A protein has these predicted regions:
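Short Lys/Arg-enriched alpha/beta "domain-start" segment
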Residues: 1-37, 59-66
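Mixed-charge, Lys/Arg-enriched low-complexity segments
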Residues: 53-81
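Intrinsically disordered, low-complexity regulatory segments enriched in Ser/Thr/Pro
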Residues: 36-59
Length: 81
């Protein structure tokens, strides 16, 4: 099983909704409902980028951090409320 398939299964099992999944040249891109983009490269490297939408009632980041590998690169910002 590839890293992208493993991460996709973990997202689905933990109710982190994927709005779009695209296979690019040498990586798979997951667009998440909270506004983040997760790129999973064929080498196993994972990069998170984008801007998290502001929610008064929910912070999606702790659930996403538990799912992704510990050596994930984080390049994101938070939207202002």
């Amino acid at each position: 099983m590839s890293t992208a398939q493993y991460i996709e299964r973990r997202f689905r099992a933990n109710k982190v909704y994927i709005t779009e999944k695209q296979r690019m040249g040498h990586y798979t891109r997951f667009d998440l409902w909270c506004g983040l983009i997760v790129n999973v490269y064929d080498t196993g490297r994972v990069v998170v980028q984008g801007r998290i939408r502001a929610f008064d009632y929910y912070d999606p980041l702790p659930a996403i951090r538990r799912i992704l590998p510990f050596d994930t690169s984080w390049q994101f910002s938070r939207a202002k409320k």
